[in-house]
């Protein structure tokens, strides 16, 4: 078993253990502050382990290797870093409970599908900067999508209290505690749009830098393929959302729907399409 697979498996185990600890805190009503501090330190350790696993997998001498699973894992890892930094300002444990399983799953996928491809022209610093910007944007969009799911659940609980009361049995009780312990929706919405603004900026930079690289390599501004189309659709979706937010004050369910739609497009732009090609169609 190769070192990258071992480290990705260890990172998946670390994320899983943290998820269990955090879940048990809500299930048994343990003291929030004490467990929260330990969880933050544990999450930082897991992020460092995950980052080392990615370093071992992606960097090969002066070349770069990437696959759909590695791209997803890198995006989630970058999202984890952003979440950890955000947690120093505002604690959103419900989002962490969504992120930890996502982190574990992304690491396991790398271990299960270890096939990588060399990235063309990876020695060019411009290509590396473009990849970093694109993957950072993917990671931030992933964070935004998971937060949108959490906010949708909180919104439903607030608007349909009778339905929430009927579901308050067993697992529903723990989920109710988790949702009730989250910051107000207004505070979460501010965090959500801050993340979306940064993601949109990085996505814009990735599109522009990708265009310049394409012109230098092929003479074309943008290749007409699924990756370009879905990336532009995601960029357009988030652009419309931000314009609507500024001009019409869009928020709440409209903002959440646009966020999830933009995430769906960004997921299809590389990870989804490469999964179909590499796993289902068995092509490199």
Task: Please place each PLM-identified region on the residue numbering.
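Hydrophobic transmembrane alpha-helical segments in integral membrane proteins
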Residues: 1-15, 137-141
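N-terminal signal-anchor/start-transfer transmembrane helix
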Residues: 8-30
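Cytoplasmic-side transmembrane-helix entry/capping segments in multi-pass membrane proteins
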Residues: 33-43, 69-71, 93-104, 255-260
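A generic, lipid-embedded transmembrane alpha helix
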Residues: 42-57, 108-111
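Membrane-interface helix-loop-helix junctions at boundaries between adjacent transmembrane segments
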Residues: 60-140
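Short alpha-helical packing/oligomerization segments
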Residues: 67, 212-240
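Interfacial loop-to-transmembrane junctions
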Residues: 243-264
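Juxtamembrane boundary at the C-terminal end of a transmembrane helix
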Residues: 268-284
């Amino acid at each position: 078993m190769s070192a990258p697979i071992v480290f990705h498996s260890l990172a998946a185990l670390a994320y899983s253990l943290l998820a269990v600890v955090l879940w048990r805190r809500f299930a048994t009503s343990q003291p929030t502050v004490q467990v929260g501090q330990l969880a933050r330190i544990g999450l930082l350790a897991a992020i460092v382990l995950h980052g080392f696993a990615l370093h071992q997998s992606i960097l090969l001498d002066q070349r770069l290797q990437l696959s759909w699973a590695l791209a997803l894992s890198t995006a989630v890892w970058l999202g984890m870093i952003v979440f950890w930094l955000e947690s120093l300002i505002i604690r959103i444990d419900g989002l962490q409970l969504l992120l930890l399983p996502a982190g574990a799953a992304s690491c396991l996928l790398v271990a299960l599908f270890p096939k990588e491809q060399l990235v063309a022209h990876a020695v060019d610093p411009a290509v590396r900067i473009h990849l970093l910007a694109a993957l950072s944007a993917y990671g931030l969009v992933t964070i935004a999508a998971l937060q949108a799911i959490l906010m949708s659940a909180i919104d439903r609980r607030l608007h349909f209290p009778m339905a929430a009361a009927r579901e308050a049995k067993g697992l529903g009780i723990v989920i109710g505690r988790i949702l009730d312990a989250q910051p107000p929706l207004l505070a979460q919405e501010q965090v959500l749009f801050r993340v979306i603004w940064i993601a949109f900026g990085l996505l814009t930079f990735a599109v522009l830098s990708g265009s310049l690289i394409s012109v230098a390599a092929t003479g074309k501004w943008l290749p007409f393929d699924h990756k370009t189309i879905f990336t532009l659709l995601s960029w357009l979706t988030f652009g419309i959302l931000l314009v609507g937010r500024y001009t019409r004050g869009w928020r709440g369910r409209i903002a959440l729907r646009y966020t999830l739609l933009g995430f769906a497009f960004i997921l299809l732009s590389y990870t989804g399409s490469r999964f179909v090609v590499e796993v289902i169609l068995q092509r490199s």
